[in-house]
């Protein structure tokens, strides 16, 4: 072992690129615990475990938020009092950055596109899911926000939701904000919308094919949300040269890819090669 790489969820505004870990870096990761409470503590534990097991070997932190740091202010700022951004760094960061960065560049190579100007949309669709838009490999926009809760319908995450829903559920169910956020993170998405059927897209698809009403509605909403994001990003970039799929569902679900391409994106000039799609 020459070196050890660590995917760290949230770098806040502190990190704009990968970095060799030292005590200052670990302290900064700790300072981002409140931004990534589900992931950053575990990420730091992994780093410290590797330091003990492999003393003297360099550890490199690769931040999920780095790709989204390339967005312009019009994309990353929320329409809330600006003081909250200045005081607390509240903004849209985006996640799955290592995936979006790599896949967008690979799509450019595969398609023989102009590496400086190619407009690429990447659909990272797995249990966690996000869509990104980039021009020449630089992030223009991405669907996740301050946390990975924003954006697409995911396995157990709600994705986009009216913020007032949180207070409404708190009042109706006598729950704390933390309890409701836990529901939105761990009990919503495909799992919640299907009535607790499953967080796995394969199970939802199978149930929908058997006539399960909520499963069908959930699957329709799932693809519809993806289609909307891709459409909005094509508009934001004034066109798109390539749409790439990755992650568990994106890579392996033939039907989801086919439905998105045929049902929603014909106006973009998308034509799916069914033989290649089944390969």
Residue ranges and their predicted role:
Residues 1-39, 58-60, 66-75:
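Short beta-strand-loop/turn "lid" adjacent to the catalytic site in phosphate-handling enzymes
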Residues 173-218:
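A mobile "lid/hinge" subdomain adjacent to the ATP/sugar-phosphate binding pocket shared
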Residues 241-263:
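Glycine-rich phosphate-binding loops at beta-strand->alpha-helix junctions
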Residues 266-279:
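Short mixed-charge
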């Amino acid at each position: 072992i020459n070196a050890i790489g660590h995917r760290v969820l949230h770098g806040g505004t502190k990190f704009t690129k990968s970095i060799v870990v030292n005590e200052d870096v670990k302290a900064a990761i700790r300072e981002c615990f409140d931004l990534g409470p589900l992931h950053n503590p575990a990420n730091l534990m992994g780093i410290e475990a590797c330091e003990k097991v492999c003393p003297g070997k360099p550890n490199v932190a690769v931040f999920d938020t780095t790709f989204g740091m390339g967005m312009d202010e019009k994309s990353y700022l929320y329409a809330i009092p600006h003081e909250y951004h200045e005081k607390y760094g509240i903004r849209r960061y985006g996640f799955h950055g290592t995936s979006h960065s790599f896949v967008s560049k690979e799509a450019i190579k595969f398609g023989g596109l102009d590496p400086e100007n190619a407009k690429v949309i990447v659909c990272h669709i797995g249990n966690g899911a996000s869509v990104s838009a980039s021009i020449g490999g630089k992030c223009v926009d991405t669907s996740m926000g301050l946390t990975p809760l924003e954006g697409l319908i995911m396995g157990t995450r709600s994705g986009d939701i009216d913020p007032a829903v949180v207070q409404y559920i708190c009042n109706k169910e006598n729950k704390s904000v933390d309890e409701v956020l836990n529901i939105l993170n761990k009990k919503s998405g495909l799992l919640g919308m299907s009535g607790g059927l499953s967080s796995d897209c394969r199970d939802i698809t199978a149930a929908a094919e058997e006539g399960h009403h909520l499963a069908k509605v959930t699957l329709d909403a799932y693809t519809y949300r993806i289609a909307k994001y891709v459409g909005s990003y094509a508009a934001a970039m004034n066109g798109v040269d390539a749409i790439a799929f990755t992650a568990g569902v994106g890579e392996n679900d033939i039907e989801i890819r086919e439905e998105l391409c045929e049902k929603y994106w014909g106006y973009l000039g998308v034509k799916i090669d069914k033989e290649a799609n089944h390969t």
